[in-house]
Amino acid sequence: ISKGLVGSEMCIRDREEGINEAGAMSSWIAAGTSYTNHDIEMIPIYLFYSMFGFQRTGDFAWAAGDSQARGFLIGATAGRTTLAGEGLQHQDGHSHLLASTIPNCISYDPTFHYELAVIFREGLKRMHENNENIFYYITTMNENYSHPEMPKGCEDGILKGMYRIKDFSKYKKNKIQLLGSGAILREMISAAEILQNDYEIDSEIWSVTSFN
């Protein structure tokens, strides 16, 4: 999916490449470098199985970095939680390690909708207002779960990579820090409830949106 900006006009174009990761990445790079090759600002957004991204087309991701491409790569169905029935090839648990090797790739592993919105807004500002030659890699899940309201004042922490999302303070004696990102964060919240209710141990929950 890509959005092209020409002056004050905006157009939206959808492309479905099929089982053609190399071709899809090539299309994304072409759109992501159109600002310098054709003097046309575009916002390419490429969605794929997260396992079929850096693991299969890591050389193209490097090429995107070398060519100063701008845009968003969305590693969908990440976290090893929902596609086990389709085989191990769909279970991604390490794409962020690969993404971290590219200096101008900014990676995030959000859990909730407001985190994703804050990251997208900042990415658009950095790439298309500040003209930074970077691109974003963001992993998302396809689990069905409730999303909480955005805590006040958390935007800066989301962008920096970590913020406190919940505080389980009841017994005021033992307190531990629980850190989670992406698919595992909701399990951290469940673990905090068990620790407090069954073991009288308080905790703080931190959403780690990025280790990048």
Which residues are covered by each model-predicted region?
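Conserved thiamine diphosphate
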Residues: E9, R13-L179, A183-R186, S203-F211
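A generic structural signal for short, well-ordered alpha-helical segments in conserved domains
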Residues: I189-A192
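Acidic-enriched catalytic cores of C-N bond-cleaving enzymes acting on peptides and small amides
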Residues: D198
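Single conserved hydrophobic/aromatic residue that forms the stacking wall/gate
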Residues: I1-G7, C11
